[in-house]
Amino acid sequence: METELIRYIEREFHAKYYDITALDFSKNRKALKYINGVITKLTKPIFFFVKPDLGASMRSMEMEDVCYFILMRGEPSTSRELTEIAHEFGHLFYGEKGYPRAVVVNGEYANIERATIISNAVMDPLINRDLHNAGLDIVEYMQYAIKVQATELMFGYPEYSKLDKYQRNNIKCLIIEKIQEWDIIQNAIPNVFVEIADKKYKRILMESRNFVKRINATGTNNPEKCKKLLEMLTKENNISDEILIA
């Protein structure tokens, strides 16, 4: 059964199975400790796959009532990548606890990024705070994000007046996430995302700061609060008819 399941995922996602037990965690033992703590709380088996054309460096997914699996763009080896694996386990952990996630209404995999970035605005800081409290180096993790995401924010989008609603949603959710994450590390490094937004997208930056205030006022310590926040965010960003909070 397990072999058939692995082969099915390989075919469906054009990915290759990766044996996580062979991975060397000596570079990041705190990531391993966090993962070991989470994995005992998961009710389904988890598998790993390498998918070179993955739009993100990693993505955790669920085959309902059957298993979890994590897609990775490449075989992990660095300390930062091990932290990222721990982060994906965090998503699975909170999913088991009933925390919400955003899903595309029509279910098209091609549009999954629109849903993911909504979820990440609330859930990523929640998970990264856990990692930080567990002693993982999330500054290293965030510096990698700067290289990838800040460059896209600076050069990958047009001026504000030419943004479509999906681009505005992406930028706003990204800034909401990064403001919270820099609060976790007490601004130990410059928040390049805010600096770029202050130059290019002042209105979005203002909206993002206001939404972070709403997050802080509401709290994220239970699934209901997080669902309420994500529903407010989709409505505010004019995509509530396309993105469902489940």
What are these model-derived regions, one by one?
Residues 8, 12, 16, 31-34, ...:
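Charge-rich, solvent-exposed alpha-helical interaction surfaces
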Residues 79, 94-125:
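Post-HEXXH active-site segment of zinc metalloproteases
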Residues 84, 88-92, 96:
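Catalytic glutamate of the conserved HExxH
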Residues 129-157:
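Short helix/loop segments within enzyme catalytic domains
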Residues 149-246:
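Pan-zinc metallopeptidase signature
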